[in-house]
């Protein structure tokens, strides 16, 4: 999308520029909404791969889940930064990134002085998600003042559809996780690294099938866009 947006910006074709930008935002949202849900549901099994004892698994799992809250806004910020770069504007991303870093540093100092040690890392992870969300809002407002609003391009509608699709997928993931034994100490899911990996693959696959199946039923154009891109990429590799 960056190359096409750069070409459209150079040719002053802002309608096409917005079209590529919003298509990119929707495709990124399709992936990041599912990724957020999967990694929150599987936060403890993922943590078990890196942590041995149950208390360490719980602590790391909570951090993973907290970080995932900011994945969607982080993905949007990434795309909007590319939009500014396509407009040959590197100053604005510097400004809104500086604001994000300032919020994070200030908040980290406050949390470090006030939070209990057991919740410090989780609270900093939540702070990161919050600061990135603020960064995303500022980036959008700055981009809106530069190229105009993005109304009529269906970003909000698509995001709402992804959220509706991921809710049943999340419930399916939780049910499969519970069927495998849940996340209590000594359960099959958290017993060993290999069982955590197997459980993660089972839960993730169930959530992926449910999510993509619902998007297919919704006739999501973003799903077709992703399929087209994957087909083109693998088609080139096979030649």
Give the residues covered by each predicted segment.
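Membrane-embedded alpha-helical bundles of multi-pass transporters/translocases
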Residues: 1-239
């Amino acid at each position: 999308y960056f190359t096409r947006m750069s070409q459209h910006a150079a040719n002053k074709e802002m309608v096409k520029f917005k079209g590529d930008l919003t298509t990119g935002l929707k495709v990124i949202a399709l992936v990041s909404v599912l990724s957020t849900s999967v990694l929150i549901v599987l936060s403890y099994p993922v943590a078990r791969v890196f942590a041995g004892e149950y208390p360490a698994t719980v602590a790391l799992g909570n951090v993973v889940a907290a970080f995932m809250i900011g994945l969607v806004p982080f993905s949007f910020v990434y795309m909007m930064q590319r939009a500014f770069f396509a407009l040959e504007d590197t100053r604005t991303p510097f400004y809104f990134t500086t604001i994000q870093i300032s919020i994070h540093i200030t908040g980290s100092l406050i949390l470090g002085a006030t939070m209990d040690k057991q919740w410090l890392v989780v609270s900093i992870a939540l702070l990161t998600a919050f600061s990135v969300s603020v960064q995303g809002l500022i980036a959008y407002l700055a981009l809106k003042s530069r190229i105009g609003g993005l109304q009529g391009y269906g970003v909000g509608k698509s995001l709402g559809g992804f959220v509706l699709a991921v809710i049943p997928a999340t419930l399916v993931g939780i049910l499969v996780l519970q069927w495998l034994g849940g996340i209590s100490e000594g359960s099959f899911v958290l017993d060993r690294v290999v069982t955590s990996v197997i459980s993660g693959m089972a839960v993730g696959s169930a959530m992926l099938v449910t999510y993509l199946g619902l998007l297919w039923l919704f006739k999501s154009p973003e799903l077709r866009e992703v399929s087209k891109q994957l087909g083109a990429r693998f088609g080139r590799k096979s030649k």
